[in-house]
């Protein structure tokens, strides 16, 4: 009977008081532990932080004494920094305020400097090419079909390699270089520019050639589809199908590549 009476209904008031006491003890112990950990850190901050950068205000003549801390004057432009008394308890908070103001001032000065030095910039997409140096900033990826013509690229690459080898050999020959005239350097630069122009011209011709070839193949496929459709409809005749492009208003072009 006694066991049944104990397990029937607990006293919630007693249980609440016990839990409240335990919670208060835990809070006090955690607060004490946190303060004990924070004390060495604050001492180290007070020792490492620069103190006395504010201006001390003297209200009356009685403050002049041996125990009064000496004022230390900081920079004149620090108008927004807080006054800090050397050796006072408020030195840490004043120092934090002063450092925050200094950081804000530096950030603002940098922002004004960036705004004054801002210039309009045109960003160019520079893509390396296999057969010519990309000094003019032209987008080489806009000419995707040129990648299919390996012989053109090989010719231009070998021409550039030959010019580079010639320049290296000339640089090794010091005596002959000293005997050369002063106009030899511009002539080599002109040769390089001429080779670049030739490579670009060859690329453009190859692109036009490929375009014409693709158009010719497309036209042949269209004619073949038309012939197949007419054959399926039952209209058979070789003479009629030869003139289908003319009937539909498509002139016949002979494929003539560039030479």
Swiss-Prot record:
Subcellular location per the Swiss-Prot or TrEMBL entry: Secreted
Record has Secreted as a keyword: yes
Propeptide: 35-102, 181-195, 237-259
GO CC term, one of those recorded: extracellular region
Molecular-function annotations in GO: hormone activity
Signal peptide extent: 1-34
Residues found modified as Leucine amide: 233
Pfam name, any one: ELH
This protein's UniProt keywords: Amidation, Cleavage on pair of basic residues, Hormone, Neuropeptide, Repeat, Secreted, Signal
Sequence repeat residue intervals: 119-123, 146-150
Gene Ontology process terms (BP): neuropeptide signaling pathway
Entries under InterPro entries matching the protein: ELH (IPR003424)
UniProt keyword Transmembrane helix present: no
Region (Disordered): 42-103, 149-197
Segments of this protein annotated with the region 2 X 5 AA repeats of R-L-R-F-H: 119-150
Family: Belongs to the molluscan ELH family.
Function of the protein: CDCH induces ovulation and egg-mass production; it may also stimulate synthesis of secretory products in the female accessory sex glands and affect neurons in the neuronal circuits controlling locomotion and feeding.
This protein's name: Ovulation prohormone
Organism in which the protein naturally occurs: Lymnaea stagnalis (Great pond snail)
Classification of source organism: Eukaryota, Metazoa, Spiralia, Lophotrochozoa, Mollusca
């Amino acid at each position: 009977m006694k066991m049944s009476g104990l397990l029937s209904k607990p006293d919630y008031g007693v249980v609440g008081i016990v839990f409240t006491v335990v919670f208060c003890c835990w809070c006090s112990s955690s607060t004490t532990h946190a303060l004990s950990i924070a004390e060495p850190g604050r001492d180290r901050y007070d020792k490492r932080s620069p103190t006395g950068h504010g201006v001390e205000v003297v209200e009356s003549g009685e403050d002049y004494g041996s125990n009064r801390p000496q004022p230390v004057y900081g920079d004149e432009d620090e108008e927004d920094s807080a006054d800090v008394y050397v050796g006072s308890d408020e030195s840490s908070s004043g120092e934090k305020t002063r450092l925050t103001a200094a950081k804000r001032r530096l950030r603002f000065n940098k922002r004004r400097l960036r705004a004054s030095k801002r210039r309009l910039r045109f960003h160019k997409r520079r893509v390396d090419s296999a057969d010519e140096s990309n000094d003019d900033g032209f987008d080489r990826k806009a000419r995707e079909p040129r990648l299919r013509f390996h012989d053109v690229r090989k010719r231009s690459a070998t021409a550039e390699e030959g010019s580079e080898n010639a320049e290296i050999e000339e640089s090794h020959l010091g005596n002959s270089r000293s005997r050369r005239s002063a106009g030899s350097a511009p002539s080599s630069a002109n040769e390089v520019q001429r080779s670049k122009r030739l490579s670009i011209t060859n690329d453009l011709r190859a692109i036009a050639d490929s375009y014409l070839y693709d158009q010719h193949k497309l036209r042949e496929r269209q004619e073949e589809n038309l012939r197949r459709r007419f054959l399926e409809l039952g209209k058979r005749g070789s003479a009629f199908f030869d003139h289908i492009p003319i009937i539909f208003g498509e002139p016949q072009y002979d494929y003539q590549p560039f030479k």
